[in-house]
Amino acid sequence: AYDGSTNTQANAARAIAIGQGAKSNTVDSVAMGTGANVASGSNYKGEAYARGVAIGNLATSQGIQGVAIGNGAAHYRDNAVALGNNAKTRAMDGIAIGNNAESGIQNDPQYKVNNSVAVGNSARAHGGSGVALGNDTYALGGSSVAAGNAAWALGERSTAIGNNAHSEGYGSIAMGREASALSTQDGDKKNVVAIGDDAQATGSRSIALGVSAQAGTLERVRDRSVYKDNPELITKLKAQKEVTDAVAIGSEASVQENEGLALGSKATVNNVRGVALGANSATAAPVSTASETINGLKYNYAGGTADSTVSVGKTGMERTVTNVAAGRISAT
């Protein structure tokens, strides 16, 4: 049916169009609102885009069994849902709920981005099977998860959970308020983990666990306006010190060299493969003791050349070590 006075069109079986300029051009479809349309244009007629629903001023439904509800809401793929003012769903089986929420990306000519879910005002799930939950969240990588206000997961299979949590790089995990995980390596040199408020981990296979724990050092870039327009070109995290296979466990624990281990509150490692055990412990450069002369006899110690060091305290905060067996002396 066509109403010349309002330019309203319902041109298919069981189609409904209500509102100035509303158009419903496929079977079992509903368009309600000024300029609302279901499969408008010559390319969208017939069964191919059946059972679409567009409700709201300028709402658009272009895909089988899709739903767009809200002023300017739109879906462009099959089985998709867009709910909220200017919500957009461009992913097959995608969901966008919230004002300005986005599921899928605008330039996806091969239709690789599917099953993405964005829930929250300005939430964006641009990666295939990505999930963005919360206001201003961003799941860019495929199979990535961002949950929490302004949480961003930008790497493939990355996870960011917590307000302002940020993960970047394949398999990186950031959990906690302002937690940051950045992997910039290739191949198997990925998968960094930062868990705890303001925890930081960068490099490759490094772990920071605890409030303000650090495995490497990061700088957070906060220019959202620039990043929002160029999500693939501008990074939000910048590595100041990258470390590999480092582990920092404890509040404010810090490892700033490869393969180091800091265990305890404010434990600090600044030497390659160094180990700091206990609160406030800190490593120093290793000192080798190859031998010792006693009563004119020279004794060579096994392991006389030290590769690194283990610290159980620091200057002014020394600890005794108990229940330790005697060391070995070599046969020569």
Where are these regions (language model features)?
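Glycine- and small/polar-enriched repetitive beta-structure motifs of secreted/surface proteins
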Residues: 1-332
